[in-house]
């Protein structure tokens, strides 16, 4: 309760009038615009009892709707608390899925650190080995970067082979892969001195752009190598039930 930042006041979701308005607005939005999926920002900061009400209202009206919450926390037990899980605890979340930061940090460690008891590729193994706590880990959203963190191509030192290996992990892992725009050509950027450096325009979207990265001719050889790798794996994933719904071994 309070202000998330000085520019972002919280809404009092425990107030019945506010809660009803938010639920009605969510239902209206799906109906009006034909939305088939919700990414719920900063899920952990919400009133979780209210979120269960809102989630249920949306699922009751739209059974095929997909919903997942941003849960920027550390550790699989903490992350799984905010989604449907197998814990025998008082609060039970009914949220379908979460943004899987634990898998992201596992891939990051695997690509940037030597093997150790708790670091390197072992961190990825340890995260995935705890999938049994989720009701359905296949619904979690897996990713390499987003608008709040460093672009992954920069994280791996702009090493094309490491980047392609990371993409291979992403597109052959359990869960629903999410790509942040620009990742398909290896856009770079860190969040320092501010987040604007990972939110640059994709070249070619504006008339004043000197190059058009939407076309093969506008991309460099390295960018096309990354593009082709993603396209090949993504098309394979679309046609492979073993990858999309198979058991994680």
Regions from the PLM with identified roles:
Residues 37-43, 152-153:
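Short catalytic-loop micro-motif centered on adjacent basic/acidic residues
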Residues 243-249:
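Surface beta-strand/loop "capping" patches
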Residues 39, 68, 143, 178-181:
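A structural signal for short, well-ordered beta-strand segments and their strand-loop junctions
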Residues 25-27, 31, 42-135, 140, ...:
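Active-site-proximal helices and loops of the catalytic beta/alpha 8
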Residues 1-23:
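Chitinase-like catalytic core of GlcNAc-active glycosidases
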